[in-house]
Amino acid sequence: MRRNTDLTIALAGNPNAGKTTVFNRLTGSRQHTGNWPGKTIERKSGRYKHAGMLIEVVDLPGTYSLAAYSEEEIVARDFLLEGQPDVVVVVVDASNLERNLYLVVQILELQLPVLVALNMTDMAETIGFEIDTDNLSDGLGGVPVIRMVAARGRGIEELKEAILLYTKQQSKERTPDPIV
């Protein structure tokens, strides 16, 4: 899925986890966000520049799983399997962590590079949830976890930096040593 960009990232997550808000913050777009499942059915893409790199962002439909029973699940699953994103940023609603982590685990099982954008941390704290991101990262096999409140723009720059750092690390891990 290369269209003259340096990186392609996929935004995945449950409905209403804030994927489109993250997409808008990253790309400067103004995609309409809605507070109901099924708002985004097709994938949308946009671009942004960061640290001299042109990065394509693909906003996948919100889905609870990759079981491929609904149109949203099919679109999301097919892109993850065939679109070859450099990294999948799974946007997770911190106030509903358990339900959201099911999709994270399914995407990890596809053996794709994953970052977790732990969104709506302000709402989670309001209802008394304290999430240890280091512990969560360890529990997910070392997947980077970035705290954010996308609606307020908090954590967006950290997410951009994490995407670059993580994709550079993944690239080094995949590059074989030269044969001498």
What are these regions (language model features)?
Residues 27, 65, 80-81, 108, ...:
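Signal for well-folded cores of large energy- and translation-related assemblies
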Residues 37, 41, 56, 68, ...:
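Helical mechanochemical/support elements of P-loop NTPase systems and associated helical scaffolds
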